Structures are given as structure tokens and as C-alpha cells.
Design a protein with these regions (language model features):
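Alpha-helical bundle segments that constitute or directly flank the non-heme di-iron/ferroxidase center
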Residues: 4-20, 29-67, 84-89, 140-142
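Flexible, glycine- and charge-enriched loops at secondary-structure boundaries
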Residues: 5, 71, 95
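Short, well-ordered alpha-helical segments
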Residues: 70-76
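Active-site-proximal alpha-helical scaffolds that flank and shape metal-associated catalytic sites
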Residues: 76-142
């Protein structure tokens, strides 16, 4: 692994441990609890990818004709993260994005994806993010059972 990445991992280890001991994990006691958690957390997974693609668009070159933009180290870091997020591998060796893999796992455990499905449909149909959230009736904290 890249020495800088190893250094960053070491630097954030304390914060990572705080996140890993977050009380939300104690609330997930069974499959039903995991389903409920995933119905909301999937939006964070989607949002992370959207943020990452925004960073890629801003900090690297994604337009044509291609020209090098910004710091090569920054481009490398962003594109390495994009590669990992867009090219995950499932248990059968099939490539898919981390988001698609998460959605597949949700469906396998019987989690309700209707809020996400409505939201994505609204976004695809050109609604703003805020209108898409409103029209999908996304209710944080009240996931569907």
C-alpha cells in the first residue's frame, strides 16, 4: 500500500476507533435491526459516491479533451478511491460498485428498498435532490419494517 495512505490510516486510527464504537452498532441486535439500519444507511452509501464523483470532477480531469489538472498525488488518491468504490467484487467474483453491492446485500436480507427506489427514480427523472427526497417520502428514523 502507498506509504502516504499507511501514514493517513495511522493518523486517523483514533477517530476510526471512536466511529467503530458508536452506540448505533449496539442497537443492531438482530437481522430486523440490520434491515432497518441498512434502509437509511444506503443513502449515506449513495451520498458518499456522489461526493466522491464531485471531488473527482473538481480535482481531476474528466472532460474532453483530457488535460492534467491539479496535483498528481491528489488525482491518484481520488482515482484510487473511485476505483475501489466503482469496481467492488461480490462473493461470486462479479464486479459492481460498492453501492450496487450494498443494495444487493439489502435485497438478500429482505430489507425494504422502496424509499431508495423512489428517490433514485425521482433523481433520474430530473427532480432536484430536495424534491426527490420529499417526493420519495424519506423519513429518517422511521424506516419501513
Amino acid at each position: 500500500m502507498n506509504p502516504r495512505v499507511l501514514q493517513l490510516k495511522k493518523e486517523i486510527e483514533g477517530q476510526r476507533n471512536i466511529l467503530l464504537s458508536h452506540p448505533v452498532y449496539a442497537q443492531i441486535k438482530d437481522l430486523a435491526g440490520l434491515r432497518l439500519f441498512s434502509q437509511i444507511h444506503v443513502f449515506a452509501v449513495w451520498d458518499f459516491m456522489s461526493l466522491l464523483k464531485s471531488l473527482q470532477s473538481t480535482l481531476t480531469s474528466v472532460s474532453l479533451p483530457w488535460m492534467p489538472v491539479g496535483s498528481a498525488e491528489t488525482r491518484y488518491l481520488i482515482n484510487e478511491i473511485v476505483l475501489g468504490e466503482e469496481c467492488d467484487v461480490d462473493e461470486n467474483g462479479l464486479r459492481m460498485s460498492h453501492f450496487e453491492l450494498y443494495l444487493k446485500a439489502m435485497k438478500q436480507m429482505g430489507a425494504d428498498t422502496s424509499m431508495l427506489d423512489k428517490f433514485l427514480k425521482n433523481v433520474i427523472n430530473g427532480e432536484s435532490l430536495f424534491q426527490s427526497i420529499k417526493n420519495a417520502d424519506i423519513q429518517i428514523g422511521r424506516a419501513h419494517v
